[in-house]
UniProtKB/Swiss-Prot annotation:
It comes from Rickettsia akari (strain Hartford). The keyword Ribonucleoprotein applies. This is Small ribosomal subunit protein bS21. GO terms for cellular component: ribonucleoprotein complex; ribosome. GO terms for molecular function: structural constituent of ribosome.
Length: 66
């Protein structure tokens, strides 16, 4: 459960903080993934692709840092 404090009726900052907390908790990603049923084999393929993408990103970052 996500709690957000409202200070002096400041709704704009409260809404911004609420959205940040939702993103940190990966709430939007979970909603998107659960919108449709994903077969276990498709889930494995997707996770492997995500891992490969992270590896490439890390390799690029490491190459530019050196």
């Amino acid at each position: 459960m996500i709690l957000v404090n409202v200070h002096a009726g400041n709704c704009d900052n409260t809404l911004r903080n609420f959205k940040k907390k939702l993103q940190r908790e990966l709430y939007f990603r979970k909603m998107k993934e659960q919108r449709y049923y994903e077969t276990p084999s498709a889930k494995r393929v997707r996770k492997a692709q995500e891992a490969a993408r992270r590896q490439r990103k890390f390799a690029r970052k490491k190459m530019f840092d050196e």
